[in-house]
């Protein structure tokens, strides 16, 4: 990630809506977002499980101020017809954004764990460095959620029943699932106060990515 800010979103999609949802994401929604001032890139992941269609979206932002900036709020208050059809159908919707407080490693892993945490580590940089030192881990990022900036009432927010809240994001990017499991075990050993209150450690695989530098603005 290049920017100081982030926006993280989890949601579930029913099987009969899956094609429409994927087309909406890749053919309209992520393009709309990354052409909004302050958005740098979008990455879409799908959970590695067969019982549910669960997705994780990570947006890279120039700064956390983008979250309640005029450009993004204008988008949120003018959802497209396609967005109006899709958004009310999303289940277990969780959304939050803020500032990245620690990064370690380089590049992006095709396989990730994106954990919601309820307590930030006392020293985020030290935890990030310890986890990225694990075999097969490419990068680790830790973010702090800004509840005020992500709680502004908007038209889109009104289409969803609930967005939940989480204090922070722990993103571990690996070369394979075994690498992620090793890093998870390490995190539990050195930061039990953080991991004891983290969300389920699901594995996600990369599905789609779009960078504002290469998007078709025409």
What are these regions (language model features)?
Residues 1-218:
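Macromolecular interaction modules
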């Amino acid at each position: 990630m290049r920017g100081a800010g982030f926006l993280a979103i989890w949601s579930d999609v029913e099987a009969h809506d899956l094609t429409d949802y994927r087309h909406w994401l890749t053919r309209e929604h992520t393009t709309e977002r990354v052409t909004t001032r302050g958005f740098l890139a979008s990455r879409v992941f799908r959970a590695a499980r067969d019982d549910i269609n669960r997705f994780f979206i990570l947006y890279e932002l120039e700064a956390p101020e983008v979250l309640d900036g005029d450009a993004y709020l204008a988008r949120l208050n003018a959802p497209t017809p396609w967005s109006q059809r899709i958004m009310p159908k999303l289940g277990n919707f969780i959304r939050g954004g803020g500032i990245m407080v620690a990064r370690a490693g380089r590049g992006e892993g095709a396989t990730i764990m994106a954990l919601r945490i309820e307590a930030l580590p006392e020293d985020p940089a030290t935890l990030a460095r310890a986890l990225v030192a694990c075999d097969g881990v490419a990068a680790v990022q830790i973010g702090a959620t800004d509840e005020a900036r992500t709680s502004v009432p908007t038209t889109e927010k009104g289409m969803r029943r609930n967005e939940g809240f989480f204090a922070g994001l722990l993103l571990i990017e690996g070369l394979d699932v075994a690498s992620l499991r090793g890093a998870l075990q390490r995190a539990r050993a050195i930061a039990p106060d953080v991991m004891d209150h983290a969300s389920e450690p699901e594995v996600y695989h990369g599905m789609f990515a779009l960078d504002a530098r290469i998007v078709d603005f025409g």
